[in-house]
Amino acid sequence: MSRPTETERCIESLIAVFQKYAGKDGHSVTLSKTEFLSFMNTELAAFTKNQKDPGVLDRMMKKLDLNSDGQLDFQEFLNLIGGLAVACHESFVKAAPPQKRF
């Protein structure tokens, strides 16, 4: 059996992190608001510590909760991860020195 690729390991890691926080308050397939805050303050501590607005995490939760059930399912969680990945990528692109085009 072949070893997982780097991308496959990243996917496994995302699933494991979601499962680590989901279910502590009841539903094992969703993040409650408390679980979401725990995830953000632990796994994305650099992001949360730099926030000046104390309501930003509440607004993020509401925006991510597409079906308005007060929980984040895995798809809604991935929307957060994808948005953060896009923002990080854009920062890297802006910070990279310009490349010569031939």
Curated annotation (Swiss-Prot):
Keywords in alphabetical order: Acetylation, Calcium, Cytoplasm, Disulfide bond, Metal-binding, Nucleus, Phosphoprotein, Repeat
PTM annotation (Phosphoserine): residues: S2
The biological processes this protein is annotated with in GO are: regulation of cell population proliferation
Q: Which residues form the EF-hand domain?
A: 12-47, 52-87
Checking Pfam families in the record gives:
EF-hand_1, S_100
Q: How is this chain modified after translation?
A: Phosphorylation at Thr-7 significantly suppresses homodimerization and promotes association with NCL/nucleolin which induces nuclear translocation.
Task: Spell out the subcellular localization from the entry.
Answer: Cytoplasm; Nucleus
Give the source's domain of life in one word.
Eukaryota
Question: Which positions in this protein are listed as binding Ca(2+) 1?
Answer: S28, T30, E35
Cross-referenced InterPro entries, in alphabetical order?
EF-hand-dom_pair, EF_Hand_1_Ca_BS, EF_hand_dom, S100/CaBP7/8-like_CS, S100_Ca-bd_sub, S100A11
Positions carrying Phosphothreonine are: T7
GO CC annotation: cytoplasm; extracellular space; nucleus
User: PTM N6-acetyllysine: at which residues?
Assistant: K24
The record's CDD domains line, in alphabetical order, gives: S-100A11
Which residues are involved in binding Ca(2+) 2?
A: D65, N67, D69, Q71, E76
Q: Name one GO molecular function term.
A: calcium-dependent protein binding
Tissue-by-tissue expression: Smooth muscle and non-muscle tissues.
* Entry function: Facilitates the differentiation and the cornification of keratinocytes.
**Assembly notes:** Homodimer; disulfide-linked.
Q: What else is known?
A: Binds two calcium ions per molecule with an affinity similar to that of the S100 proteins.
Name the UniProt record assigns to this protein: Protein S100-A11
Look up and give the organism this protein is from: Oryctolagus cuniculus (Rabbit)
The gene that this protein is the product of is S100A11
